[in-house]
């Protein structure tokens, strides 16, 4: 039996939303194994002096929980 867990994260990038999403997944993958998908819940932009300076996303990342024997699934 497979069990999937979700982790909510926020990430931002001056390059754009796609880069912010990639940064969220990259950061999560540094401590999680078995990442299955990323769901972008919200998009937000930081504005300073009438210009967009940061692109921010709130995401839910799904990953498989390992079984007690140490493997996935």
PLM feature spans:
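Short, well-ordered alpha-helical segments
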Residues: 2-36
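Noncatalytic linker/hinge segments flanking ATPase motor cores
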Residues: 19-21, 47-52
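C-terminal structural segments of small proteins and small subunits
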Residues: 50-73
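Flexible glycine-/small-residue-rich
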Residues: 11-13, 42, 59, 63-65
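Short, conserved loop-to-beta-strand elements that form functional interface hotspots
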Residues: 38-47
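Short connector loops at helix/strand junctions that flank enzyme active sites
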Residues: 4, 35-38, 52-58
């Amino acid at each position: 039996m497979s069990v999937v867990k979700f982790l909510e994260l926020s990430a931002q990038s001056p390059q754009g939303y796609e880069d912010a999403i990639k940064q969220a997944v990259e950061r999560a993958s540094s401590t999680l194994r078995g990442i299955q998908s990323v769901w972008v819940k919200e998009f937000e932009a930081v504005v300073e002096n009438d210009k967009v300076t940061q692109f921010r996303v709130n995401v839910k990342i799904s990953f498989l929980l390992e079984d007690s024997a140490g493997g996935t699934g």
